[in-house]
Amino acid sequence: MKITILSGGTGTPKLIQGFKKIIPNKDISVIVNTGEDTYIGDLYLSPDIDTVIYTFSDIINDETWYGLKEDTFFCHEQLKNYGFNEVLKIGDRDRALKMHKTALLKKGIPLSEIVELEKSSLNITSKIYPMSNDLVQSKILIEENGEKLLLKFHDFWIFRKGNANVLDVFYENSNYAKPADGVLRAIEESDFVVIGPSNPITSIGPILSIKEIKEALKEKIVFAVSPIIGENPVSGPTGTLMSAKGYSVDVTGIYGYYKDIVNVMVIDSKDINKKKEIECDVLCIDTIMKTIEDKVNLSKNIVEYYKSKCTY
């Protein structure tokens, strides 16, 4: 069995930890959001890519879901002494990966090839693909003191901590972006696709904004795991951004966002009363992933549902 997972940097990596326990890692492909990629100074950040790499190599800081566990921060502290305002705290070993990526990008090497080098160096057998080698950026339109501002996601979430009146979200350059090498093949060869419980708007939305990817997904069996329970997003600014795009902040809103491509919605058992409002198959189960047992259980239930009921 081969699966493809669409992932951002939080939520979905927890599910990846479950799948990698029950499916041979070589049969798992992950297409990762790069809509949050940005430069801090001269350092290129691809936060979701790095998080997925660290997740597969079992070195992810699973308290923050960013950076490496037990990392040190000598460089960050020294930069502060020099007056450099590095708001995002980057660890020393994490910085090394980012420096490597930056140096190769400056040489003109595509991001997908760099990711292949990095995962190979960490003995990762799963396939990890950036959604595109073209720069597609999530831009957040906010209103502040009567003025409209267009922010990168980093500026919105890290600098402002999501405290803003959000009017809309755009995916800059997505009309011209092409899927990275291997992305469409991974979708085509997979038995089914899982959209993980990442923020639909800024983690999964940029991937779906690339037309060829979305069209390829329409030909597959697609599960979508809701990142919302009741009216409460599990993490991040999901609620604010869903509202800005005109979707209700609940599982019906998640279904509405994915309805063009989803075959099975995976929702928490607490939302069983919403099942009748969802016009596709529904797998209702505990979706909170606090322990590795939780992650494995959710992954197993998705696989078993596919085996028993998905004969589209």
From Swiss-Prot:
It holds the Pfam family CofD. CDD domains: CofD_like. Coiled coil: none annotated. It catalyses: (2S)-lactyl-2-diphospho-5'-guanosine + 7,8-didemethyl-8-hydroxy-5-deazariboflavin = oxidized coenzyme F420-0 + GMP + H(+). One of its GO terms (molecular function) is LPPG:FO 2-phospho-L-lactate transferase activity. One of its GO terms (biological process) is F420-0 metabolic process. Keywords: Magnesium, Transferase. Its EC number is 2.7.8.28. Transmembrane segments: none annotated. Pathway: Cofactor biosynthesis; coenzyme F420 biosynthesis. 7,8-didemethyl-8-hydroxy-5-deazariboflavin binds at D50, K89. Its cofactor is Mg(2+). The keyword Calcium does not apply. Catalyzes the transfer of the 2-phospholactate moiety from (2S)-lactyl-2-diphospho-5'-guanosine to 7,8-didemethyl-8-hydroxy-5-deazariboflavin (FO) with the formation of oxidized coenzyme F420-0 and GMP. Belongs to the CofD family. Homodimer. This is 2-phospho-L-lactate transferase. It comes from Methanococcus vannielii (strain ATCC 35089 / DSM 1224 / JCM 13029 / OCM 148 / SB).
